[in-house]
A protein has these predicted regions:
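Amphipathic alpha-helical segments enriched in hydrophobic/aromatic residues interleaved with Lys/Arg
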Residues: 2-4, 103-165, 189
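Helix-turn-helix
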Residues: 205-212, 216
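Terminal helix-turn-helix DNA-binding modules in bacterial transcription factors
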Residues: 185-193, 197-202, 221-261, 282-307
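Short hydrophobic/aromatic patch on the recognition helix
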Residues: 66, 215, 219, 264-265, ...
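Short, Lys/Arg-enriched N-terminal segment that forms or immediately precedes the first helix
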Residues: 166-175, 217-223
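Key DNA-contact positions within bacterial/archaeal DNA-binding proteins
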Residues: 213, 262-263, 278
Length: 307
């Protein structure tokens, strides 16, 4: 039985096999389709066209063309594509992850990032090859891993920059360092997925099963900034994206970025970007390729009317 599934044109794909029998499979979501991963499976998604939204235990994320996201096995993500969206993904069982981790320097961690057009094309080609080869015989695991090895190696290569930080993590053994890094990466992703509010250290410590003191110390050592500073930076970047991509009022952007009042938001935004939110939005709109045409049309009409 082929383990490739596709949700297209508004279809909802439910991946809800029991934890003990969670399978490795290739998944695609396109054109208003959606996929719900209820099985206990690590998942990786790459956005190839359009936009998709992801809701998971780590929060809410927007994937644009070229973005990728990797989620832990208990994240239970729901991915929804827009009308032009197309994304491909992999769900990996616990056994598949254990086998993959045996490859030298080949491990996958929770996180998100961006790929070049060339890497995106490679992902699609390798995903298609894996979808053709994955079957579920009685001895499924050796076949599954053999079929997925090329794309998993490629995805691990895309995470090379993230994995370079593993040596900063405390621990005597390589496996312990990887374990700590995996937990901290999930906390970092949790901050990105909750840019609409202030995240407390206690939440992140509970997520990683570390004490608040140990978590804060290790986080700063790994990312060169405190959890509070990282949260503030991500919230400001989130606000900047809202100013560029939406018509929300400044007060609405402030509220959507976790600020109680506009004054504190204005101070934080100016400290981060060196200008006001209004000025930032105006500059972003004027830099768009179609802005000159959009503003030129009414000017010509006014001149023709003689007013």
């Amino acid at each position: 039985m082929e383990q490739a599934q596709w949700a297209d044109r508004g279809q909802l794909l439910q991946l809800d096999t029991p934890e003990a029998s969670a399978q490795t499979c290739c998944v695609a979501v396109s054109r208003l389709g959606s996929a719900q991963v209820s099985a206990a499976a690590f998942s990786v998604w790459v956005q190839l066209r359009g936009t998709s939204w992801v809701e998971a235990k780590e929060g809410k994320f927007r994937l644009r063309r070229g973005d990728w996201i990797a989620l832990e096995k208990d994240s239970r993500p729901l991915l929804q594509a827009d009308r032009h969206g197309f994304s491909v993904g992999l769900t990996l069982s616990a056994e598949a992850l254990r086998v993959v981790s045996q490859f030298a320097e080949c491990s996958l961690y929770a996180g998100r990032g961006h790929v070049s057009c060339r890497d995106a094309r490679i992902v699609l080609r390798l995903w298609r090859e894996a979808a053709k080869r994955i079957v579920a015989p009685e001895s499924a695991m050796p076949v599954d891993v053999a079929a997925l090895r090329p794309i998993l190696l490629h995805l691990a290569g895309l995470q090379r920059e993230l994995a370079s930080r593993i040596q900063r993590c405390p621990g005597r053994s390589r496996s312990r360092k990887r374990q700590v890094f995996g937990r901290l990466q999930r906390a970092h992703l949790y901050l990105q997925g909750n840019c609409d509010r202030v995240v407390r250290i206690s939440e992140l410590a509970a997520l990683t099963s570390f004490s608040s003191w140990y978590f804060s110390k290790t986080f700063h050592c790994l990312y060169d900034e405190s959890p509070q500073a990282a949260s503030a930076r991500m919230r400001m970047d989130h606000a900047a994206n809202l100013l560029k991509d939406t018509s929300m009022m400044i007060g609405e952007v402030a509220a959507a970025s976790g600020f109680d009042n506009c004054c504190s938001f204005a101070r934080a935004f100016r400290a981060r970007f060196g200008e006001s939110a209004t000025g930032y939005r105006s500059a972003a709109l004027s830099s768009r390729p179609d802005s000159a045409k959009a503003t030129g049309v009414p000017r010509k009409a006014v001149t023709a009317d003689g007013t």
